[in-house]
From Swiss-Prot:
Placement of CHCR repeats on the sequence: 411-561, 572-736
Keywords recorded for this protein, A-Z: Acetylation, Autophagy, Coiled coil, Cytoplasmic vesicle, Disease variant, Dystonia, Endosome, Leukodystrophy, Lysosome, Membrane, Metal-binding, Methylation, Nucleotide-binding, Phosphoprotein, Protein transport, Repeat, Transport, Zinc, Zinc-finger
Species annotation: Homo sapiens
Protein name: Vacuolar protein sorting-associated protein 11 homolog
Modified residues (N-acetylalanine): A2
Cited PROSITE patterns: CHCR, ZF_RING_2
Task performed by this protein: Plays a role in vesicle-mediated protein trafficking to lysosomal compartments including the endocytic membrane transport and autophagic pathways. Believed to act as a core component of the putative HOPS and CORVET endosomal tethering complexes which are proposed to be involved in the Rab5-to-Rab7 endosome conversion probably implicating MON1A/B, and via binding SNAREs and SNARE complexes to mediate tethering and docking events during SNARE-mediated membrane fusion.
Cellular location(s): Endosome; Late endosome membrane; Lysosome membrane; Early endosome
Length: 941
């Protein structure tokens, strides 16, 4: 009784009498009538109702006259005569439109079971598909209870003599059903219920003194004795899945719940129980105060009908009484259409309509019963948004009462639904750092925190100086356990001075840039930073060395240089003292790291020399920088021996062949540092012979001038002319060098004699004896050439006269063809044949095979073609001469015209490569004469 009195009572149901329908509009029972219909009468059922049930959209009643009545939602009562005497039991299936009834058709104890198919009709009444006697044997006994399995394969009937019969098979047909006695006992059976769990079917049997269960889906029907306490008629029920389909037995002292194999919890609801019913998670108990005891426990519902009876609706999960009211003489409690209906002995039907969830919650809120509201919302399957709203209101209530610890626990339950800033603002204003920390921790744990939340939580830890919590927060075992923005955490910890914690996060979560920033800028641990870079993958090691290389080079130059050497040759990340030497290495572009060595020339030289030795294919910038560095060292060195060594190194580098494509850059470097040997070497490699000559001339190195001419004069003959001009301007006695130059000029015929004389005329020390031998030899050669030319002219004139005579003879005299052999095949000439005026004759088939033109002699055609090409060239050159003279006269810039013609090669000497030596003279003949010569080869007929 004490436990029962502690349960709170609420009015979560609305009670009203069901009225008769005003029209056939299908209004729900218990609905409030419209205004103006106050005269509506309350619904009154026929007298003598003894049993009730519900399902399939109707309330079903049985009376003492043998009739069964149906009350659908339209409240249009209908019935039919089911038995001749009375109806004692009804069971309406919920999943099938099948009704099972027990009644009497004759006097005496002979109950009949009838199965009705409500979907089929027989003379306007439901079709009775099966009738059989309830008593299996010959001993008369009264039926006390009835239950049917929803699969229509089991039906159990309990009797007052303590026996239970089980009908197994299709209960709607006689031939498919088998009846047997399942249970025999000494106490009246007061309740039966089937429970289906997977493929196993249990039958609960309760009597006035005990509770037991059977497995009826097998063959042997094993029995389990559950308890030695029983209950009265209609005081047992089967719960829904919310209570795990437990069998409820309502005794006078307690209400017990049973599983098929054991007893479950019990509730101390005192009072003499009359009815037990289960409805949508609620336990409905109709009881009478124990102060008014009935004459018989088994037949108490029929005694003292004028007593007041209490109906309580219990919420067993949330442990409160959802509704409590008083009725006079309750016949039964039914559930249909989402409501409860209470039938009283006076024929009235009372509707108990459950309030909606929001209304119930508001009632609890008004009483500040938030815990109960939460439990209720969960049992009513309220969505997460609705629950979050309750948690928020509960938290606000606790916060207003000063219970900050309790409030934050409720706010934590709103995470994911309630905006975090709402909670954060409350605890920031109240300076409740501990509570705020708890909320933020959970926010991160659920991976719903942003960068601002992480910042705030870490600030809370630092203000509380709670290093243990801070370490617990950041030191997670795996990446999946991290519920915060790591980069934000690193920033906050760094700003707060928790460098070791920030380093831990940066290293474990691969935030390499932050790790190096803290090591280099805050802790100044350059060795550790360099070691860390050496462990990184190639791409990250490369990028971080470019970013932090200058700082590291400034503080630890040797170690930094060593790492750069490895990075640019064959880089493999170090893995805690070991490295995978078999894995293929990577290498960076060494040229990109040269700026890191600013102000560290010693390390730069070591790096560059290492790269040039280990990787000869290093970028050109490596060699350019190394050359510049060596030249700088050479220029600033004072020690002669060291300077000579540096000189050799620079020359060796220049001769390595790495500066062919960057000749100009290397030359500029050598000139900047006055490295003359390098300049001369590069001049020679670049074929800049003029510059070599000028260098030796500037330094008056006469022998070197002659040497340059001898070595490179074949490639650039103008060197000899420049040498002659150079020595001619010298006032010193340079006869030896002038003679050497003149000898070469004479041999190669590089200058006209007059120009040689004019050039040497500028030298006051040069006498006629210097050039006497040269002039004599030149005059002799010219005399010989003149004699040869005169002889050639006479010969050509005679040849011209002869040819003209032949032409005249061809024009004036007949031509006799006396050739006897073909000029192509040298065989005897036969008809048909082809003859030409030039004297050549051919077989016709030979001519057709070898001739390129029908009008030209195949034998003379090559020579004739040369002559024609020469004529065309002369005519073209004459036309160009006229055009050139015209443009020269009309142009304002004569020099540009001349330059344009030079660029087009107009003034180049015309030479036909196929011409024999005699062709040069032929080219001087008149064009008209040349055309006449071609007549020798015209075809004769």
């Amino acid at each position: 009784m004490a436990a029962y009195l502690q349960w709170r009572r609420f009015v979560f149901f609305d009670k009203e009498l069901v009225k008769e329908p005003l029209s056939n509009d299908g209004a729900a029972p218990g609905a409030t009538p419209a205004s103006g219909s106050a005269a509506s009468k309350f619904l009154c059922l026929p007298p003598g109702i003894t049993v009730c049930d519900s399902g399939r959209g109707s309330l079903v009643f049985g009376d003492m006259e043998g009739q069964i009545w149906f009350l659908p939602r339209s409240l249009q009562l209908t019935g039919f005569q089911a038995y001749k005497l009375r109806v004692t039991h009804l069971y309406q299936l919920k999943q099938h439109n099948i009704l099972a009834s027990v009644g009497e058709d004759e006097e005496g104890i002979n109950p009949l079971v009838k199965i009705w198919n409500l979907e089929k009709r027989d003379g306007g009444n439901p079709l009775c598909t099966r009738i059989f006697p309830a008593i299996p044997g010959t001993e008369p006994t009264v039926v006390s209870c009835l239950t049917v399995h929803e699969n229509l394969n089991f039906m159990a009937i309990g009797f007052t003599d303590g026996s239970v019969t089980l009908n197994k098979g299709d209960i709607t047909r006689d031939r498919h059903s088998k009846t047997q006695i399942l249970h025999k006992g000494n106490y009246p059976v007061t309740g039966l219920a089937f429970r289906q769990a997977g493929k196993t079917t249990h039958l609960f049997v309760v009597t006035t003194e005990n509770v037991q269960s059977y497995i009826v889906s097998g063959k042997d029907y094993p029995r389990v004795e559950l308890d030695t306490h029983g209950c009265g008629l209609r005081c047992s029920a089967l719960s829904d899945p919310s209570q795990d389909l437990q069998f409820i037995v309502a005794g006078d002292e307690c209400v017990y719940l049973y599983q098929p194999d054991e007893r479950g919890p019990c509730f101390a609801f005192e009072g003499h129980k009359l009815i037990a019913h289960w409805f949508r998670g609620y336990l409905i108990i109709v009881s009478r105060d124990r102060k008014v005891s009935p004459k018989s426990e088994f037949t108490s519902r029929d005694s003292q009908s004028s007593d007041k009876q209490i109906l309580n609706i219990y919420d067993l999960c949330n442990k409160f009484i959802a509704y409590s009211t008083v009725f006079e003489d309750v016949v039964d409690v039914l559930a249909e259409w989402g409501s409860l209906y209470v039938l009283t002995r006076d024929g009235r039907v009372h509707a108990l309509q459950e309030k909606d969830t929001q209304t119930k919650l508001e009632m609890l809120f008004k009483k500040n019963l938030f815990e109960m509201a939460i439990n209720l919302a969960k049992s009513q399957h309220l969505d997460s948004d609705g629950l979050a709203q309750i948690f928020m209101q509960y938290g606000d209530h606790l916060y207003s009462k000063g219970n900050h610890d309790g409030a934050v626990q409720q706010y934590i339950r709103t995470i994911g639904k309630l905006e975090p800033s709402y909670v954060i603002r409350k605890f920031l204003d109240a300076q409740r750092i501990h509570n705020l920390t708890a909320y933020l921790q959970t926010l991160h744990r659920q991976s719903l925190a942003n960068a601002d939340h992480t910042t705030l939580l870490l600030n809370c830890y630092t203000k509380l100086k709670d290093s243990s919590k801070l370490e617990e927060f950041i030191k997670k075992k795996s990446e999946s356990e991290v519920h915060f923005d790591v980069e934000t955490a690193i920033k906050v910890l760094r700003q707060a001075g928790y460098y070791s914690h920030a380093l831990y996060l940066a290293e474990n979560h691969a935030h390499h840039e932050w790790y190096l920033k803290i090591q280099l800028e805050d802790i100044k641990n350059y060795q550790e930073a360099l070691r860390y870079i050496g462990k990184l993958p190639f791409e990250q090691a490369e990028s971080n060395m470019k970013r932090y290389g200058k700082i590291l080079m400034h503080h630890i130059p040797e170690q930094t240089t060593q790492l750069l050497k490895g990075l640019c040759t064959d880089y493999r990340p170090s893995l805690e003292g070991r490295s995978d030497r078999e894995a293929p290495g990577c290498r960076a572009n060494s040229e990109e790291f040269i700026p890191i060595f600013a102000n560290n020339p010693r390390e730069l030289k070591a790096f560059l020399e290492h790269m040039s030795e280990v990787q000869p294919d290093s970028p050109q910038g490596i060699y350019d920088t190394l050359l510049e560095l060596r030249l700088q060292n050479w220029a600033h060195e004072k020690d002669p021996q060291v300077k000579e060594k540096l000189h050799a190194e620079a020359i060796s580098l220049l001769k390595s062949g790495r500066f062919c494509d960057v000749f100009d850059k290397a030359l500029v470097l050598c000139q900047m540092h006055d490295f003359q040997d390098g300049v001369l070497y590069l001049y020679e490699q670049g074929k800049l012979f003029q510059q070599i000559m000028h260098y030796h001339m500037q330094h008056e190195q006469y022998r070197q001038v002659i040497s340059v001419c001898e070595r490179h004069g074949e490639q650039d003959p103008s060197l000899w002319e420049q040498a002659l001009s150079y020595f001619a301007r010298k006032e010193e006695d340079c006869k030896e060098y002038v003679a050497a130059v003149l000898k070469h000029i004479e041999n190669k015929n590089l200058m006209p004699p007059l120009l040689v004389v004019q050039t040497l005329a500028h030298n006051s020390t040069a006498t006629l004896s210097v050039i006497r031998d040269y002039l004599v030899q030149k005059l002799q050669k010219q005399s010989q050439q003149i004699a040869q030319d005169e002889l050639r002219v006479r010969r050509y004139r005679e040849e011209t006269t002869r040819i003209r005579q032949e032409i005249q003879e061809l024009k004036a005299s007949p031509k006799i063809f006396q050739k006897t052999k073909c000029s192509i095949c040298n065989s005897a000439l036969e008809l048909p044949s082809v003859h030409f005026l030039c004297g050549h004759s051919f077989h016709q088939h030979c001519f057709e095979s070898y001739s390129e033109s029908d009008a030209d002699c195949p034998t003379c055609l090559p020579e004739n073609r040369k002559v024609m090409d020469m004529i065309r060239a002369q005519e073209q050159k004459r036309d160009l001469h006229d055009q050139f003279q015209h443009q020269l006269r009309c142009s304002n810039d004569s020099f540009s015209v001349i330059a344009d013609y030079f660029g087009r090669g107009v003034f180049n000497k015309l030479t036909l490569l196929t011409d024999p030596p005699t062709a040069r003279l032929t080219s001087s003949l008149e064009a008209g004469l040349q055309r006449d010569l071609l007549m020798h080869s015209r075809r004769g007929t």
